[in-house]
Amino acid sequence: RVLFRSSIFMDKTTQTQIIKLIHQEVIPAIGCTEPVAVALAAAKAAEVLGCKPEKTEVFLSANILKNAMGVGIPGTGMVGLPIAVALGTLIGKSAYGLEVLRDLTPEALAEGKQVIEDKRIHIALKDNVDKLYIEVICSAGDETSRVIICHEHTNVVYVEKNGVVLTDRRKEGVSCDASGDEDELRLSFSTVYEFAMEMPLDEIRFILETADLNRKAAEASLKGNFGHTVSKTVSGVYGRKYMGDSAYTHMLAMTAAACDARMDGAMIPVMSNSGSGNQGIAATLPVLSFAEDIECSEEQLIRALMLSHLMVIYIKQSLGRLSALCGCVVAATGASCGITYLMGGDKVQISYAIKNMIGNITGMICDGAKPSCAMKVSSGVSTAMLSALMAMENKVVTPVEGIIDENVDKSIINLTSIGSKGMEATDKLVLDIMTGKSC
């Protein structure tokens, strides 16, 4: 097998940049991040307006619209964008970021329903914009406000009141250009691996927060019946009878539990990754569950979680925030790296796990955020375990097979190119199907 050259560990500046990047990308979120980001823009627009709007107009990119149509909104028992927008304008606080709706009350929910009934919210598709684009215009009498979020879920790039521009960061290149910031630290497989394996433990211990928060989400899910109850199915009578009771089924059940609750609109915070709560869940809980089953050390858990989360961030750098490719493919690839490491795998075997993942479930489409995402996450976790097992046996999808390259970084670029470029027509067709249904 091809061995990697050893290298001197990275300089302090790069270490600091990576830690900053992780803190930017791994953050708490309540509810699916797309409708929550729309609620955030609505909250900001209402704050700028200075009063409750009489009318709210929302213009969204296709990917935002797709991911917000069928998912539960936390604490409402309702699905979709109108209630997210209404609550954003009524009780949302932009300072809360992706927890913008955490002050929800029954009274506010009732008021939000009335706003919808009065047809004071109008939502439309906006063409030829970034894949992550949210524009909200609020009005009351002669007063108006306008807010644009672009490229990232909390990235407010434009604020206007009564025709006067208060903020316009588009001119600074913060922009709605999906290529992102040219000064952004660009990761590689070796950088990710070396950082996770060699950083002083106390400097990366913070990644345990992902385990604490996402475990609580999984535990809370088991107290009710959320979504399609994928987790309870795996651990139920038939699940135990036909799938058994093992480290494998434990990680399936724990991961699906958090996703079941989140996609059904439970008021449960999770630690997200790269703008996605499901990605944060899938990068965390399979690794945590497996670590607990094999009773590994705290250091091993920290390094496995860091490897998983940073790998997801790396892959998302070239894939982009939103795409036609299901995010669980990316997140489960990170999890497979963490699991392989916990099995005792070395750098080469971890690279094998990545190639095995790419050779298996590349092409799984994203057809919006919804309760059935828990099934897709479970498929990703299942493949993560299989890929790790094969890697430990030094079995890997070879460069003569499909999109796999001898170089692991090139294999990742092949994956993300398919997701960001090759599946654009798929993305459009999926949205056409979703918006054309009678239900």
What is each model feature region?
Residues 10-19, 51-64, 246-265, 297-315, ...:
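Acidic-glycine-rich active-site phosphate/pyrophosphate-binding loop
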Residues 39-138:
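Early transmembrane hairpin of solute transport permeases
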